[in-house]
């Protein structure tokens, strides 16, 4: 059954336009609350609500609070807190659910709502569909004796800071390291600097002055140029860039080189494999560079590919019983440390790995160079693009065997097929990408 409101990461959109309106968000809170009450009729459920630093967070927080309490659910409010912080506190406080008001790496004009289930895990499909079904029912406020209560909780940030620090090995310290930390003017602005400072690092802070409008604005994991310049200017050892809600990580070394999620996952996996502590293998996505897969195989580390989206990486990790995975975008999962992707915790795992291996980022990542990728977006007229591309696709896969691969991905929002070819030779990637694209264009003419 397809979802009507939920995407791969909750409900998201431009503020003031459906579904990110106070009216709909209140009803969303009510629907989710009714589902929680139906699942736990012996006691009154409690949910945790956190948000990033967008100006619209105040409005949407109030709407959610109204919806949940109308359904008879108690609400705890944390104020600004990273998405993984809400996941952690949902588990630590043994709550029925956690809710985050954030649009992650998007600009301030957007916002979204995503849920964590009991235990700090993302909602499964069945629960999302229950909430969607409840959204189609009329909203009926509980009698006054059955309304929920709401209050702000103290110490949420401090508890999460201590949790982050606990994932860094006790025998190690960040003393002697100079770090530039870019918090994207987002939810980690009052968290990440304290974590690194309390572990001993000398800090330079950027993107730590949110005003409601500057989240992800030329700062953060999606705009590493600012971090590169700051690392070079301050002669720092490393730069750490997080995104607006704190679940992505990009790093920069002392020479100003940028390291994406794939490279950082490789660093973590290599260090764990060297110590015999890597459980199973590594999960990436269909877009993970093949060169990384081959490098892991040389280390004897199995590699699996999930669909694009950290939700699907997480599902495959659980299915295989593995712990490490993620995406080039900087979503990194270390399931022995946290139930969800966490930029701060991932950066601590990278820094610990470097200390344990006694190598630099550049030295470890020299194990592999990303294969060149050619991406062509092909617009079609609704034709059978799979049939049209079958012959050149088969030829390409035969020609690239062991040297590259082809990924064809239809857009979910427009009549476009994304043709991606990667190979150890740029000309080879270009040739086959153009051949497949031309075959689709021919039947669409």
UniProtKB/Swiss-Prot annotation:
Binds 1 Mg(2+) ion per subunit. One of its GO terms (cellular component) is cytosol. The modification Phosphoserine is found at residue 104. Keywords: Isomerase, Magnesium, Metal-binding, Phosphoprotein. Mg(2+) binds at residues 104, 243, 245, 247. Disulfide bonds: none annotated. Activated by phosphorylation. The active site is at residue 104. It holds the Pfam family PGM_PMM_I. Its EC number is 5.4.2.10. SUPFAM superfamilies: Phosphoglucomutase, C-terminal domain, Phosphoglucomutase, first 3 domains. InterPro entries: A-D-PHexomutase_a/b/a-I, A-D-PHexomutase_a/b/a-I/II/III, A-D-PHexomutase_a/b/a-II, A-D-PHexomutase_a/b/a-III, A-D-PHexomutase_C, A-D-PHexomutase_C_sf, A-D-PHexomutase_CS, Alpha-D-phosphohexomutase_SF. One of its GO terms (molecular function) is phosphoglucosamine mutase activity. GO terms for biological process: carbohydrate metabolic process; peptidoglycan biosynthetic process; UDP-N-acetylglucosamine biosynthetic process. Its cofactor is Mg(2+). Gene3D superfamilies: Alpha-D-Glucose-1,6-Bisphosphate, subunit A, domain 3, Alpha-D-phosphohexomutase, C-terminal domain. Belongs to the phosphohexose mutase family. Catalyzes the conversion of glucosamine-6-phosphate to glucosamine-1-phosphate. This is Phosphoglucosamine mutase. It comes from Chromobacterium violaceum (strain ATCC 12472 / DSM 30191 / JCM 1249 / CCUG 213 / NBRC 12614 / NCIMB 9131 / NCTC 9757 / MK). The lineage of its organism: Bacteria, Pseudomonadati, Pseudomonadota, Betaproteobacteria, Neisseriales.
């Amino acid at each position: 059954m397809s979802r009507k409101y939920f995407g791969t990461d909750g409900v998201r959109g431009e503020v003031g336009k459906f579904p990110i309106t106070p009216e709909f968000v209140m009803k969303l809170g009510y629907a989710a609350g009714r589902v929680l009450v139906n699942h736990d009729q012996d006691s009154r459920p409690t949910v945790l609500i956190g948000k990033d630093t967008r100006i619209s967070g105040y409005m949407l927080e109030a709407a959610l609070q109204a919806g949940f309490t109308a359904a008879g659910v108690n609400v705890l409010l944390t104020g600004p807190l990273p998405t993984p912080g809400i996941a952690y506190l949902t588990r630590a406080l043994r709550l029925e659910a956690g809710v985050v008001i954030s649009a992650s790496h998007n600009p301030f004009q957007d916002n979204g709502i995503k849920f964590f289930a009991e235990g700090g895990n993302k909602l499964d499909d069945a629960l999302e569909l229950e909430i969607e079904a409840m959204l189609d029912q009329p909203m009926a406020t509980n009698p006054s004796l059955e309304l929920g209560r709401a209050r702000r909780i103290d110490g949420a940030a401090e508890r999460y800071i201590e949790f982050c620090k606990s994932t860094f090995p006790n025998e190690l310290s960040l003393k002697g390291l100079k770090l530039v930390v870019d918090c994207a003017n987002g939810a980690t602005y009052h968290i990440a600097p304290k974590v690194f400072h309390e572990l001993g690092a000398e800090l330079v802070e950027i993107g730590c002055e949110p005003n409601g409008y500057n989240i992800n604005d030329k700062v953060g994991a999606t705009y590493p140029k600012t971090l590169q310049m700051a690392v070079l200017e301050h002669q720092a050892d490393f730069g750490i860039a997080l995104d607006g809600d704190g679940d992505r990580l990009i790093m920069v070394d002392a020479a100003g080189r940028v390291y994406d999620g794939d490279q950082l996952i490789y660093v973590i996996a290599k260090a764990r494999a060297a110590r015999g502590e890597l459980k199973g293998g590594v999960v990436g996505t269909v877009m993970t560079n093949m060169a990384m897969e081959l490098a892991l195989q040389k280390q004897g580390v199995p590699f699996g590919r999930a669909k694009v989206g950290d939700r699907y990486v997480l599902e495959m990790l659980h299915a295989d019983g593995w712990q490490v995975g993620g995406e080039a975008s900087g979503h990194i999962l270390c399931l022995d440390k946290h139930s969800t992707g966490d930029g701060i915790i991932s950066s601590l795992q990278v820094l610990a790995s470097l200390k344990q291996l006694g190598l630099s980022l550049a030295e470890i990542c020299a194990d592999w160079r990303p294969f060149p990728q050619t991406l062509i977006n092909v617009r079609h007229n609704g034709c059978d693009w799979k049939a049209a591309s079958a012959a050149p696709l088969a030829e390409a896969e035969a020609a690239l065997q062991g040297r590259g691969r082809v990924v064809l991905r239809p857009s979910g929002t427009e009549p476009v097929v994304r043709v991606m070819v990667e190979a150890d030779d740029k000309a080879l990637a270009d040739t086959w990408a153009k051949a497949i694209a031309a075959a689709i264009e021919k039947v669409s003419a």
